[in-house]
A protein has these predicted regions:
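C-terminal scaffold of the Radical SAM
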Residues: 1-117, 174
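Extended hydrophobic-aromatic, low-complexity segments
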Residues: 110-111, 122-123, 138-139
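Ser/Thr-centered flexible coil motifs
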Residues: 87-89, 147, 163
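Short, amphipathic alpha-helical interaction segments positioned at domain boundaries
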Residues: 151-175
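A short, conserved structural fragment
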Residues: 131-141
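Short amphipathic alpha-helical interaction segments
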Residues: 117-132
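Accessory beta->alpha helical hairpin/"wing" motif in late/C-terminal subdomains of nucleic-acid enzymes
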Residues: 139-157
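Non-catalytic, well-ordered alpha-helical scaffold segments
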Residues: 92-100, 124, 151, 155
Length: 175
């Protein structure tokens, strides 16, 4: 079903920029890297990235709890305190850069990765495994991109890059 929907949208002129995002009229905004922006989100469930700080307002994935989360957010009086966040280590910043860029249709810029982290992304063990499954490919313009099949599995692929420390934080998060 997913692949059929992707094909239908692409046949109708949509550009796939991530697993779930398709844009009909691509602009220069679609070309922006997913790894550099300072992203400040507002609202219930908003997720922000400010340098090495990552934080989010409370959110839920439980349908019956969503209204309560929104009500709690609406009752907040002090928005200057980040209650759900952490400072990312250098390794976490590396993993976040990989996840955010690899999941984005432009892919990961190998030169930028080396500039930031001092080594080639070709040394990333998981990249070799993903290439063997034909889920990623190197492009002529120096990027590592998901293949069409890789994009279909991007929820799974993204999980592979989550470190044990972050996984523990995710598992202990209270919805």
């Amino acid at each position: 079903m997913y692949c059929a929907a992707c094909d239908l949208l692409k046949d109708r002129g949509f550009l796939q920029t991530s697993m779930r995002r398709f844009i009909h009229h691509p602009s220069t905004d679609a070309e922006i890297s997913c790894g550099d922006e300072v992203m400040l989100s507002c609202g219930s469930g908003g997720r922000s990235y400010l340098g090495n700080l990552h934080y989010a307002t409370r959110y839920t994935v439980c349908q019956r709890c969503i209204a309560g989360e929104i009500d709690d957010y609406m009752g907040t009086t002090d928005f200057t305190v980040a209650r759900n966040g952490f400072i990312l280590s250098q390794e976490e910043r590396r993993q976040r850069f990989i996840i955010k860029n690899l999941m984005y249709y432009m892919g990961l810029d190998k030169t930028e990765y080396k500039r930031r982290f001092g080594e080639s992304p070709d040394n990333v063990t998981l990249f070799r495994q993903l290439a063997e499954r034909q889920w990623i490919e190197n492009t002529d313009n120096g990027r590592v991109c998901l293949t069409s099949e890789g994009m279909a599995y991007s929820d799974y692929i993204g999980q592979l890059f989550i470190t044990p420390e972050i996984r523990e934080l995710m598992e202990t998060y209270s919805y």
